[in-house]
Amino acid sequence: RISAIATPQGEGGIGVIRISGEHALKTAGKVFEAKNGKPLVLAGSHHAVYGHIVDEKGQVVDEALALVMLAPHSYTVEDVVELQCHGGLMTLRKTLELTWKAGARPAERGEFTKRAFLNGRLDLSEAQAVMDIIQARTETSLAMAAGHLTGHFSKGIHAMRHEILGMIAHIEAAIDFPEDEVDDVLTYDIQKNVVEIRNRIAGLLQTAHAGRILRDGLLTAIIGKPNVGKSSLLNSLLREERAIVTDVPGTTRDSIEEYADVGGIPLRIIDTAGIRATDDVVERIGVEKARSYVKEAALILALFDASRPLDAEDEEILKLVRGRDAILLLNKDDLQPVVTAEMLQRHVKKEVPVITISTRTQDGLEELTKAITAKVYAGTQAGQEGTFVTDARQAEVLRQADEHLAAAIRTIEADMGLDFISIDLRSAWEKLGELTGETVGEDIINEIFSKFCIGK
């Protein structure tokens, strides 16, 4: 049996200690005394019992509720007790230590969810989605994680595996009864079905870019020369006054990093120092950091002042974004414009959007949101996030499964025989099973759950 704090550590109204495994009720009963005097093992499943946490000497540590969930009707499919105390740091630590003295051991990272997976309550994709739900930063990210948790992604994988297994069964039947002479018809049907499954895999792989961004965020650098409105843009995207805004160039000397919800997409925004030549040592460090962030960023928002002619500093910004995924923003369009979007467009490729905005009046921000959304969802359909590929491992497994299916088609075209086709199909079937956890190795399972927090 294992135990851990299941709520964020710190001060709060409620803190939860979770205990799971054989004799979980016995362990909880050693640290919890019910107000009604009845042993906790007599409590019914999904009943909350009021009482107190007590130490070895019978001294009260805190008042608490014990929530009992008996196997198999619990998160882990094991007996589970959740001790709900007050959310003080010392209270939770003391209670946790008492559960260890009572026979539990400290839970490893993600061990509760790992047990739910090993006990068949969740498949691997659904288990991974638990952490994604916890870390979701936008409603769209949450919808994607919830879709995985409720099996929308897995359903498609199970369907493909079922169809592949059906093809394998037909091949094996044809091998066992060769007198039927259906090889040509069978291989034609198999090739047609394999092509259809490969198309589905290709569709899933198209979602990998958007899925990764919705899960991890899009690293976005805001760059421009000093006093062009970078901090004002950050504040507008965050909908709060996060960065200091003044008319003094060089106010932002270091980089500011924040997450913003832009059209449901989590942007990990870095507001950089204004890029210019400077003798100020501190500002120069900030400028160098800004240049390094430009290299790392997946998206660059480059700001230019519409009310002033382009100068050498603006030319430097244009050089930095050349060949990068960027959106050019012409700020201060509420003032008398000197630079137009058409003038700025001449300096970059046609596919680089140029948007006129005003961080003072918020004009153009909706168009910016649409441009970012279009970049993220390119080739995919918004509203289907529950079936998106969400991480690099899933994408790689799908690519490898597709390679096995492509090999099956080559085998058919080379007329190499049913045995060889079956080998390729079975390899694809096993590879797809790694997504749901049905054919995955223990090392991969351990790696996935090691990224979870303790208590989940």
Give the residues covered by each predicted segment.
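A glycine-rich (often HGG/GG-containing) alpha/beta subdomain
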Residues: R1-A143, G147, G151, I327
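C-terminal-of-GTPase-core extension/linker across diverse P-loop GTPases
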Residues: R1-I5, Q9, G51, E139-D261, ...
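Glycine-rich, N-terminal phosphate-binding loop of Rossmann-like dinucleotide-binding domains
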Residues: I19, C85-G87, L237, T272, ...
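Conserved beta-strand segments of alpha/beta enzyme cores
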Residues: R105, P266-R268, P353
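Alpha-helical scaffold elements adjacent to nucleotide-binding pockets in ATP/GTP-utilizing enzyme cores
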Residues: L98, Y293-E296, E316-I317, A371
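Inter-motif core of Ras-like GTPase G domains
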Residues: E283-S307
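Short alpha-helix of the ABC ATPase nucleotide-binding domain corresponding to the H-loop/switch region
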Residues: P249, I275, E283-V287
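Switch I (G2) and immediately adjacent beta-strands of P-loop GTPase domains
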Residues: Y50-D62, A66-L70, G250-T278, E296-L299, ...
